[in-house]
C-alpha cells in the first residue's frame, strides 16, 4: 500500500502545484482589476458632471412663468403701470422709489419702479388733461401784421370791451381772454384767434 500511495502522491503533486500557482496569480491580479474599475467609474462620473454643467456662453433660459410675467407687464397701459407701481409700493412697503432696496424686497423692484416713474407721471398728466372739462383761454402772442383783425376778434369774445380796450389788451400780452370755458367753446375761441395771427393756450 505504501508504494501505491507514494505513486498517487507523485501523480497529483504537479496538478496541485499548478492549481496553487493559478490561485496566487489570481490574487495578485485582483487589486489591479479593482483599481482599474475605480478609475473607470471615476472617469465616468467626471464626464457626466462636465456634460451636465452649463456652458458660459450658452444663452440663459428663463422659466415660462417669468417669461409670461414680463409679457404681461410689457402689455400694460400707463394707467395700469401706475396702479402696479402703487400696489408694489404698498405690498413691499416702499416709501420712496429712490430709496435703496429693503430687506424682503424683490431684487430690482426699486430700479424698475424708478424707471417707470417718468412714464407714470406723463400718463397722469395726460389723464388730467382728459378729465378736464373747462379751460381758461389765454392769448400769449400776436403777429404785428394781423393786430387789427385780432383786436376785432377779441371784441367778439370779451364782453363789455371796446376797440381801444381790445387794442391795449393785445399790446400787453399775455392776457386772459375768457375763463372757465367749456372745452368745445374754448377750442372754438382758440381756433378763431389763431386764424387771425394770435397764439393761444388753454389752461
Swiss-Prot record:
| Cross-link Glycyl lysine isopeptide (Lys-Gly) (interchain with G-Cter in ubiquitin) per UniProt, renumbered positions | 155
What post-translational events are described? Two mature forms are produced by differential two-step proteolytic cleavage. Cleaved by the mitochondrial processing protease to produce the long mature form and subsequently by the mitochondrial intermediate protease to produce the short mature form. In the presence of CUL3, undergoes 'Lys-63'-linked ubiquitination at Lys-155 which results in proteasomal degradation.
Q: Which Gene3D superfamilies match?
A: 3.30.1390.10, Single helix bin
Q: Which Pfam families match?
A: Ribosomal_L12, Ribosomal_L12_N
* InterPro entries registered for this protein in UniProt: Ribosomal_bL12, Ribosomal_bL12_C, Ribosomal_bL12_C/ClpS-like, Ribosomal_bL12_oligo, Ribosomal_bL12_oligo_N_sf
A GO MF label? mRNA binding
N6-acetyllysine PTM sites in chain numbering: 130, 143, 147, 149, 155, 168, 178, 183, 190
Q: Ribonucleoprotein: present as a keyword of the record?
A: yes
Q: Name one GO biological process term.
A: translation
Q: Where in the cell does this protein reside?
A: Mitochondrion
- The coiled-coil regions, if any, are none
Gene Ontology CC entries for this record: mitochondrial large ribosomal subunit
Tell me the domain of life: Eukaryota
Transit peptide boundaries: 1-39
Q: Which keywords are on file for this protein? A: Acetylation, Isopeptide bond, Mitochondrion, Ribonucleoprotein, Ribosomal protein, Transit peptide, Ubl conjugation
Residues recorded as bearing N6-succinyllysine in the entry: 155, 167, 183
Indicate yes or no for the key word GTP-binding: no
Note the subunit structure.
Component of the mitochondrial ribosome large subunit (39S) which comprises a 16S rRNA and about 50 distinct proteins. Interacts with NOA1.
Q: Explain the purpose of this protein.
A: As a component of the mitochondrial large ribosomal subunit, plays a role in mitochondrial translation. When present in mitochondria as a free protein not associated with the ribosome, associates with mitochondrial RNA polymerase POLRMT to activate transcription. Required for POLRMT stability.
Q: Which PANTHER family match?
A: 39S RIBOSOMAL PROTEIN L12, LARGE RIBOSOMAL SUBUNIT PROTEIN BL12M
Query: Record's HAMAP family?
Result: Ribosomal_bL12
State the family named in the UniProt similarity comment for this chain.
Answer: Belongs to the bacterial ribosomal protein bL12 family.
This protein is called: Large ribosomal subunit protein bL12m
Its source organism is Cricetus cricetus
